[in-house]
Amino acid sequence: MTLFSSISSMSSSMTSSKSSFASFGNGTRVSSNSIACSVDCDGKGVSSGSDLTGGAKSGGDCGGKGRPNNHGHGHENCHGGKGPGNSC
């Protein structure tokens, strides 16, 4: 019975660890968006609204590299971009 109880508790901790991982994954997604935004704001990255997309109206994460007619999200700390938004 001890072995069964040990397996059962192990299985339960794996389940709770899996749900922790899911919420950590969501947090990571938010962090990576912030990092992508910082890179775009520094002018070292290419946003999704750059010339590579053919001038689509997305403007990228920060709107820092998009064409003038883009209406993407802009970050409040970005400089030199055309995306008019205030957040990534």
From Swiss-Prot:
Region annotation (Disordered) ranges: 1-25, 45-88
GO biological process: sorocarp development
Composition skew (Low complexity), residue ranges: 1-24
InterPro entries recorded: HssA/B-like_chaperone, HssA/B-related
Biased composition (Gly residues): 56-66
Name of the gene this protein is made from: hssl64
The organism's place on the tree of life at top rank: Eukaryota
Family: Belongs to the hssA/B family.
This protein's name: HssA/B-like protein 64
